Structures are given as structure tokens and as C-alpha cells.
Amino acid sequence: MRFRIYKRKVLILTLVVAACGFVLWSSNGRQRKNDALAPPLLDSEPLRGAGHFAASVGIRRVSNDSAAPLVPAVPRPEVDNLTLRYRSLVYQLNFDQMLRNVDKDGTWSPGELVLVVQVHNRPEYLRLLIDSLRKAQGIREVLVIFSHDFWSAEINSLISSVDFCPVLQVFFPFSIQLYPSEFPGSDPRDCPRDLKKNAALKLGCINAEYPDSFGHYREAKFSQTKHHWWWKLHFVWERVKVLQDYTGLILFLEEDHYLAPDFYHVFKKMWKLKQQECPGCDVLSLGTYTTIRSFYGIADKVDVKTWKSTEHNMGLALTRDAYQKLIECTDTFCTYDDYNWDWTLQYLTLACLPKVWKVLVPQAPRIFHAGDCGMHHKKTCRPSTQSAQIESLLNNNKQYLFPETLVIGEKFPMAAISPPRKNGGWGDIRDHELCKSYRRLQ
């Protein structure tokens, strides 16, 4: 039997099949993207703290001790679908960088100050910070970037309530929440914190070779903050699109800070004073932890001091030049055995930066630490009590706020400050390498 082939019919049939395939593919692609980016669905399901593990265990020989006995090996954890969807969502949001509360014509650009707030999971304090921002004069001119290491419906709702200034949310892509059962989270194959190194080598846990200076193994909950801070520093200066040609300052805050209503007014005058009378000042700080009761006689005064991590880590403002000098110290920052980002910076001022930092700081603080609980505290959180005390101080001194001019009150001798004894918690080579990698990330 002879078959007759009609080229026109074959061509038409081919085009019809291709069109049907494209429609099916594109509809599935849109559905997958919509599913991945739907906050209500993600927020309605709690993210589990660990993946699912197989019931049986294998046997492996310790690689660094040929004479060691065979030990059970914990299998590599599986990653549940919800965790993968969170990772996908974070990647997409960091790529899209959707600005809110700005004109949609594409002509908006940031002013002379950008705020970057490091946010974990303390919404009660974040609410106070947002309230203080809402009361700040001139805040409509300021871009506020919230950098998160925890996805939360409550926190996202709080950020959505910010309608008084431009807002951008970015997300630390290597958080414990996104890697709950593997590094940089807590891998079940990791060594227990207090296990001795010899015992760890015999056990064969994966980081047995890398305890910290005090013989302890890493704890992810402590490592994360330093990781987040360094990633955020690089990301906002190098990867936030709207800041690519930015020449102003970036003010770094944390979720438990509280700002005075004249902080921006004072900041602009500090910046002008720095340019005119202290060109050698490297950084600006909005205040210290010193308790004061009255702004009388000091509200218009700033001091020039040697930067000290335990005093000047709140409201730290950096220029691009200061950032570029810092980022050149990546290896030193990422290998220094202290899980505190600020104490590590103190070490950099001695070991890597061209000189010790000179800071310009107001005698009457325009920033306050509302968080009396958290990583370094064991107290019960009392945000309402703290905020009431701060508000009382500001109300009692409102006649001294918004000074017309600023003057340098005192210039202290510049001298290197020895960093406090390092705290450890940062001996794991995996932390070192991940930290270094942020500079290479696109």
C-alpha cells in the first residue's frame, strides 16, 4: 500500500501540536510561579524545624582516624517541599527587589540617607522601631530596607503597615529557617557543642576538626547573626539595584532599636559637620548606651572619639568608601573567632583597616536600645516597659530636640582600643568559607 504525504497538512499538524504544547507549558509555568510566590499559602503553613529522616542508619568509617571503630552514620537529611519553596521565594524576592511607596514612573532615587534594619523574629520590638520611624521628621525622604533572616506572616504584616516612606524587603538566603537540618543550620551530623575534640574525631561528626578557641563546636543560632550582618553589608552596597550609583550614607539598625523624632534632622547636621570640621572621621554613630536623664546643654554637641564596638555599634552609618575598606578585610572578618559582628569589627580596626576608626557621635543619643532580651540576655521581654521609658525621656526633653546647629563638644585623643577577649563560636571552616563567598555572589 502506498502512503501519500501532504506537506501542507504535515506542517499544519506540526504547528498545532507545538502551539498546544506551548500553551500547556506556559500555563504550568505560571501556576508554578504563582504557587511559589503566594505569601498567604506559605504563611498558613509553619516551616518545620527539621527535615524528614530515614528510619535506618548506615555504617561509615571515620575518615580521619583509620584505627577508629565503625560508627553509625546519620543519613543526610531530606529537604521538605515547603523549605524548598521558601528558598525559591527568597531568591525571587531578592531578585525582583520590589520597592513600595514610591512613584511607579521609574524616576525615584534615594536621598542622602538609607536605613537598613536587620530583622530576626521579634515582632514586638520591630513594631516599636516602626512606630519611632513613623514619628520621625523627614522620614518620607528616607529609603528603609528591612533585611530578614526569618519568614513570618506577622512580620510581613508589620512591614506592610509602613506607608510613610519608601520600603524594600530583602532576605538573607542562608538562614537557619531555609536550611533547618543542614549547614548553615544544624546538621544532625554536626558535633555536639561541648564534645571534646578527641571524642569528636572518634565519633566522626563532620566538623570534628574545627572547634573554636575554647574547644566548643558551632551553634547555628549564634553563627547566623554574623553571617547575616556581613551578607547584608555586601548585598545592600553591591546588589540592591536602586543603590548602584548611590553616594550617600547607609545607617545600619537592628529590630530592637528605637529612634528619636529628630534623628534625621540631627544626622544631616552631623554629616555636614563631618565634612566641614572632621574630614578624617570614618563613621557616624547616633548614640551610645550611656544612660542620661537630661539633654540640657548637650543636645547640640557631638564628640569625636575612637570607635569602640561596645559603645558605638547602634546606628552605625557608613559611606561607600568606608564599606569598600571593610570589604577588603573579608578574610580577616570571616576567620576571626568571634560570633559577634561588632567585636569582629573592633578587631579589624587593629588588624586590617588602614587605621583605627574615628567616629562622630552625639552627646545626647538619638538612638536607643529597646531590646532587654535576645541573644545576649536571659531576661523576659518587656517591650512596653522599655518603650515607655524611652518615650518619657524624649517627652521630658522635647524642648531640646531639633537643635538649629551642632558643634563639636570634645575631641578625644585617638588611640587603638584593644578588642575584648574574643568570644569564640566561629571556629568552623564552613562558616569561614560561606562568609567569604558573599563577596562573590551575584
UniProtKB/Swiss-Prot annotation:
Top class in the EC scheme: transferase
Pfam families: MGAT2
Residue positions binding substrate: 118-122, 149, 224-228, 293
Topological domains annotated Lumenal: 30-442
An individual GO BP term: protein N-linked glycosylation
The EC number(s) this enzyme carries: 2.4.1.143
Pathway(s) per entry: Protein modification; protein glycosylation
Main location, first listed in the record: Golgi
Organ and tissue specificity: Detected in liver (at protein level). Detected in liver, brain, thymus and spleen.
Topology within the bilayer: Single-pass type II membrane protein
Family label: Belongs to the glycosyltransferase 16 (GT16) protein family.
Protein name, UniProt field: Alpha-1,6-mannosyl-glycoprotein 2-beta-N-acetylglucosaminyltransferase
Gene that this polypeptide is encoded by: Mgat2
List of glycosylated residues: 64, 81
Catalytic activity: an N(4)-{beta-D-GlcNAc-(1->2)-alpha-D-Man-(1->3)-[alpha-D-Man-(1->6)]-beta-D-Man-(1->4)-beta-D-GlcNAc-(1->4)-beta-D-GlcNAc}-L-asparaginyl-[protein] + UDP-N-acetyl-alpha-D-glucosamine = N(4)-{beta-D-GlcNAc-(1->2)-alpha-D-Man-(1->3)-[beta-D-GlcNAc-(1->2)-alpha-D-Man-(1->6)]-beta-D-Man-(1->4)-beta-D-GlcNAc-(1->4)-beta-D-GlcNAc}-L-asparaginyl-[protein] + UDP + H(+)
Cytoplasmic side: 1-9
Residue positions binding Mn(2+): 256, 369
GO CC annotation, single: large ribosomal subunit
Described purpose of this protein according to its UniProt entry: Plays an essential role in protein N-glycosylation. Catalyzes the transfer of N-acetylglucosamine (GlcNAc) onto the free terminal mannose moiety in the core structure of the nascent N-linked glycan chain, giving rise to the second branch in complex glycans.
GO molecular function, one term: manganese ion binding
